[in-house]
Amino acid sequence: MAKKRTAASPGTLVVLEHHSKVLADNPLGDPHVRRLAVWLPPQYDAGAGSRRGPRLPVLYDLVGFTGSGIAHTNWKPFGDNVPERAARLIHEKKMGPAIFVFPDCFTSLGGNQYVNSTAIGAYADYLTKEIIPFVDREFRTLASREHRGCFGKSSGGYGAIIHGMKYAKHWGAIADHSGDAYFEMVYGHDWPNTLNELTKYREPKRVAGAYDAPAEARARKGLAAGLDDGRVKRFLDALWSKEKLSNDEGHAIMNVCMAATYDPDPRAPLGFRLPYNMETGERIDARWRNWLKHDPVLLVGKYAAALKTLKAIYVDCGWRDQYHIHYGSRILSQRLAEHGIAHTYEEFDDNHSDVDYRMDVSLPILCRALKP
């Protein structure tokens, strides 16, 4: 797009403060009082001054890792933010009016996957047991799953497909843009880099010369069970004191966050275990199996009945995704087809970054499915 488009009526952005009981005393000590942005389309003001105006479908925007919902309402150069995009699509009559909700699910580990974890917090419960009822009380929504959907990209896309599986009683349609899938590839390729980053926080520090592998294994027995020997804690403490993270640090904290998401263990030093021995680099099969219990490509069969209740499932991914998610997306589509689950799957010539323009495809599909 060459310049900003302004023809559409902008609607109204409301920012509320929500006090969460679910997130109070969460394991990371993250705030339980959070801002919740809600965008109301121009049609919401029909019958202004009364509560007799139209009730509308609701779409929840689950942002990606390192993001927060309200960030999707920020001004963007050239492209649309999500409220602008929704306003334009409504103005162009490509979709009907809907309320958009932007939850804040950021954590000290950089984000989460919109699931419950004893190491991070109960973010699935936060969404389904607190935010949904709160929004339905405060706004004129069509307050049933048949008129409520969620969409997201990357971690948000993962959250959308997982909620369509495990929490389908709350959602009528979902859109998964480049969501994490096929963990063997999407996460496995990056863990060696994370181990190298964590090695910087090993004590004692590495020195050149002979390396006594048997002695190191005896001294660090916990590593074979995925336990921290102190380097992960030192890594996190160092990052939490920084204003800017390097690319390697950003990827490392992402993988640490995934470990806290997929393999929490209240008995472990940090409340979770790692899937690799940090000294030898060996994958720990018992720990990795816990990760695979959360892989969408392996969950379709288990949740096929729930997925079939959804009125729309949309999945897409760029075929140059730098995290190789397009392979997992293809497998996911294949598994959905094998179980007779209706869905739309598309690919496009792009990578993982700055692909919000794909919402021009997904949002109309969701709105058509959720309209009264």
Model regions and ranges:
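Non-catalytic cap/lid and distal C-terminal segments of serine-dependent acyl enzymes
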Residues: 1-372
